[in-house]
């Protein structure tokens, strides 16, 4: 335990927190170009074919991003918007693609949680 005099001289050092999305370089989102669109399988208790894309960001870093929702129109050279947010059962996937922006279309026939998937309000 430091004395008062030691605290006056040096002060306390604030704990540094490591960022969970280093490729975004402090931005909320970043634009990128798809270099590869493919499916991969999740970790042990789960079983599926998860849609992911390898994306080269405007910060010149290449990351793996998850494509949320049912169905997508992405292919190589598609321009996408990438946000942070990991996928728990896909190791190494720490980013998600924003649906309904740039080249990514929103999910069709989506009724609930539409804003998350870039789906427009259906005309009744």
Swiss-Prot record:
This is Small ribosomal subunit protein uS12. With S4 and S5 plays an important role in translational accuracy. Interacts with and stabilizes bases of the 16S rRNA that are involved in tRNA selection in the A site and with the mRNA backbone. Located at the interface of the 30S and 50S subunits, it traverses the body of the 30S subunit contacting proteins on the other side and probably holding the rRNA structure together. The combined cluster of proteins S8, S12 and S17 appears to hold together the shoulder and platform of the 30S subunit. Residues 9-18, 108-118 have a biased composition (Basic residues). Belongs to the universal ribosomal protein uS12 family. The modification 3-methylthioaspartic acid is found at residue 89. The keyword Transmembrane helix does not apply. Gene3D superfamilies: Nucleic acid-binding proteins (2.40.50.140). NCBIfam families: rpsL_bact (TIGR00981). Keywords: Methylation, Ribonucleoprotein, Ribosomal protein, RNA-binding, rRNA-binding, tRNA-binding. Transmembrane segments: none annotated. HAMAP family: Ribosomal_uS12_B. InterPro entries: NA-bd_OB-fold, Ribosomal_uS12, Ribosomal_uS12_bac. The keyword tRNA-binding applies. GO terms for molecular function: rRNA binding; structural constituent of ribosome; tRNA binding. Residues 1-32, 105-124 are annotated as: Disordered. PANTHER family: 30S RIBOSOMAL PROTEIN S12 FAMILY MEMBER. GO terms for biological process: translation. GO terms for cellular component: small ribosomal subunit. It comes from Salinispora tropica (strain ATCC BAA-916 / DSM 44818 / JCM 13857 / NBRC 105044 / CNB-440). Part of the 30S ribosomal subunit. Contacts proteins S8 and S17. May interact with IF1 in the 30S initiation complex.
């Amino acid at each position: 335990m430091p004395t008062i005099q030691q605290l006056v001289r040096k002060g306390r050092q604030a704990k540094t927190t490591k960022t969970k999305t280093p490729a975004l370089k402090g931005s909320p989102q970043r634009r990128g170009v798809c270099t590869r669109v493919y499916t991969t399988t999740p970790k042990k208790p789960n079983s599926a074919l998860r849609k992911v894309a390898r994306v080269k960001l405007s910060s010149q870093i290449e990351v793996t991003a998850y494509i949320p929702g049912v169905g997508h129109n992405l292919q190589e050279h598609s321009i996408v918007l990438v946000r942070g947010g990991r996928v728990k059962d896909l190791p190494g996937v720490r980013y998600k693609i924003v649906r309904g922006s740039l080249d990514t279309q929103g999910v069709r026939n989506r009724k609930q949680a539409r804003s998350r998937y870039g789906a427009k309000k259906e005309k009744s």
